[in-house]
Amino acid sequence: WNHYEMVYMLLAGLSTPLVLSVHSIVSFDFATSVIPGWHTTIFPPYFVAGAIFSGFAMVLTLMLITRRVYKLEDYITIYHIELMNIIIIVTGSIVGVAYLTELFMAWYSGVEAEQYAFYNRATGPYWWAYWSMVTCNVISPQLFWVKKFRTTPWIIVLISIFVNIGMWFERFVIVITSLSRDY
């Protein structure tokens, strides 16, 4: 068990900076681009928060299924699940604030192409993807403020699946809506 604990701590120590560096570097690739909709400095913390957000949602989905199949209710308690849901509320709120910050920065910059890129995301040909992203990533996690939703396993699985669908839509919206037209 000593070796297990040592390796466990080592992997935890390695994976934390790995997550931070990978998502920060990818976000800088976008942020240093001149393509409207990508050229924003909010991307590094936004991508890291999104990674934590979607990671917790995926872990919750798999954990609750595993908990049920292998009858681990005595080991993985509602208390543990509720704490994870609180992290989803916090990171989902951070992602929501990042969406609003992106819109504000596009408006405040006065750059017409940036303003159009964000207006086009919400009302253009891919409006359905944008609003699906907002619904899944910002609105659905807010249901966890209600204790019944935070402690009912099938509702938690449903919301965490919505979060992961929303994070897929986020990548779609960032990449496709910015590249789908010429500026």
Regions found by a protein language model. Give the residues of each.
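Long, contiguous internal "core" modules enriched in hydrophobic/ aromatic residues
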Residues: 1-133
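Juxtamembrane/interface segments at transmembrane-helix termini
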Residues: 35, 62-68, 146-147, 155, ...
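Residue-level marker of motif borders
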Residues: 97, 165-166
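Hydrophobic, well-ordered secondary-structure elements that form the walls
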Residues: 97, 141, 171
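Hydrophobic positions within alpha-helical membrane elements
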Residues: 107, 142, 175-176
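Extended C-terminal subregions enriched in glycine
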Residues: 128-153
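Central hydrophobic cores of alpha-helical transmembrane segments
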Residues: 155-165
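Membrane-proximal extracellular juxtamembrane segment immediately upstream
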Residues: 168-183
